[in-house]
Design a protein with these regions (language model features):
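Extreme N-terminal starter segment of soluble prokaryotic enzymes
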Residues: 1-4, 28
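Short acidic-hydrophobic, aromatic-tinged amphipathic segments that line or gate anion-handling sites
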Residues: 125-132
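A short acidic, often aromatic-flanked loop/helix-cap motif at beta-alpha or helix-coil junctions
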Residues: 11, 133-137
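Pre-active-site segment of Zn-dependent metallo-hydrolases
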Residues: 9-14, 21-81, 85, 89, ...
Length: 137
């Protein structure tokens, strides 16, 4: 087992970690996929902070810990990169996630309702709500 950090390494925002359960098999899970914020983005190309610059073909799912933007804000970019696997979250987080993503897209990306709705439609197909004390397999 290994953990690969794709964010929140030199600071606290941009949480995005890959749990590789068995490096011999395509069995990774992504834990969060958040935006970098504040001082951690100063002097850096903002587009490079949004890109998904790691391979996603062996990732079996995304586990969202909670609905703060520094934990979920890059999900639209993950979807745009071709991610099409389950997005696991608690029932409460699963209910909030589309609202948070919609707001983030309107504030930081576009007000084009067609683009926003396309992203939300794709997102809603992938969300899997998990009750507390329920295991995922």
């Amino acid at each position: 087992m290994q953990i690969i950090h794709h964010g929140a390494v030199n600071g606290v925002t941009g949480s995005c970690h890959q749990l590789d359960i068995n490096p011999q098999l395509p069995s990774s899970y992504l834990i969060d996929c958040g935006l970098f914020q504040g001082a951690e983005t100063a002097g850096k190309n903002s587009a490079s902070q949004l890109q998904i610059d790691f391979p996603i073909d062996n990732i079996k799912g995304l586990i969202v810990t909670h609905c703060h933007i520094d934990h979920v804000g890059r999900i639209p970019y993950l979807l745009a990169a071709g991610f099409n696997q389950p997005i696991y979250a608690t029932t409460a987080t699963a209910a909030l996630l589309p609202l948070v993503i919609e707001d983030a897209l309107k504030v930081g990306v576009t007000r084009d309702q067609k683009l926003i709705q396309a992203c939300l439609n794709q997102l809603s197909k992938l969300i899997v709500a998990i009750d507390y004390h329920q295991w995922i397999a």
